[in-house]
Amino acid sequence: MEKVLRKRAWRDLKENKFRYLALAFLIIISMYLVISLVGAADTIIDGTAKQAKKHKLEDGQFQVFVPLTTKQKENLTKKGITLEETFYLDFRQKDGSKLRIFKNRKKVDKINLDQGRLAKKASEVVVEKRYALEHNLKIGSKITIDGDSYKVTGIGSVPDYDACYEKLSDSTVDSKQFGLAFVTEDAYDNLKDNENSIQSEEYIYAYRLNVIFFNLFFNCFWLIAPFNRYA
């Protein structure tokens, strides 16, 4: 019986060899694609996590109508929170695009430079890389913001604008019409004092939860958890 089955199987393979070869080829290609996609996804996830850690990606942000007082900021930092002012002003450029101006970041959502350096003088600026590409801006290029000329000293990105949407409700990124720029504190204050921005300054704070905060959270969780079980 086994001999008959072997002969039949062998005959079937010979008669349909092209079909089985095609099937084997498809299986191999499918396995290759799956392994490639998994490997690529793992690389992207790992790379994103490393960049987030390196450039201090925020744990969250909140917006207020008026800036926090020094006392309020101190109270938050004492609870184990690192705060960063990510206030911004929007300006309309001559080509019709909108440029969102921030101060240089220091502690949270730090600038990831692809080229050049941070702005150190009031006449210098770092431009978001996609906007720079769409507007042919390079290191050493000049850009006019609110009538003043700025020299591009850096090109890069920030983790909170990984996809550079103007609004959270936007469905697509249009770097030809919207971009980011980072200037010194003095340059930012001058732009604010001129009062020529499209709208009033937006007061947004980015924050990171420190180890102290996490320890407090988990200690509270393990104290409360046994009681919740019997609630």
Sequence positions of predicted segments:
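Membrane transport/envelope proteins' first extracytoplasmic loop
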Residues: 2-231
